[in-house]
Amino acid sequence: QVSQLLALKRAQSGAASPNAEAANAAPPHASIPQTIGEAVESVYWEAERLGITIEVEGLEDLPVNADPSFAMKPDDLFTILRNLLENAVRYSPKGGTVTVKLAQIEPPVLCVMDEGPGIPQEDRARVLEPFYRRLGTNVSGTGLGLAIVKTICDRWKLNLTLSDARPENQDAPGLCATLKHS
């Protein structure tokens, strides 16, 4: 899609990067609970159409007045979460569940998990490259979503880890994308 190409170019150009901030400006902070809500809302109708349930975990246990955040622009966190959620919805089976989980509050650790086929260990580095698509999937896409996510994570020094969401299920281990500051 053209919109994903443009998003990748913006991410690669460093537009709105930390170095572009005014020297005396306060560092940006992206509220994780708020951005989760916005990102889930952005993919809700597609998930509904495909029979996918989206669950959010970890926010119900937040202390009063707690607002865990990542040191980054809110729009960048939204782009990361939207891309991860779009992939999770796209690859999950009908009737499946996608889970967004705030696994740790301080420092924040955020996970997006699905029940799809997962990504074999040997392909995990390659799927972060632009235009790379795994063979053998019947899911349409451009191969740009995870490249955009990786580029933005690198810019804001977020560590992105891909692992099996359900390693005990060899047929459909799912994918868990974990975000935390490096």
What do the PLM-derived regions correspond to, one by one?
Residues 88-89:
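Short helix-loop "hinge" at the ATP-lid/N-box region of the Bergerat-fold HATPase_c
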Residues 95-107:
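Short beta-strand/loop element within the Bergerat-fold HATPase_c
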Residues 157-169:
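Glycine-rich ATP-binding loops of the HATPase_c
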Residues 119-131:
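Short conserved segment of the HATPase_c
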Residues 145, 149:
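Short alpha-helical Gxxx[C/S/T] motif in the catalytic ATP-binding
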Residues 7, 11-26, 64-72:
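Conserved micro-motifs of the catalytic ATP-binding
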Residues 22-23, 46-61:
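Short conserved segments within the C-terminal catalytic ATPase subdomain
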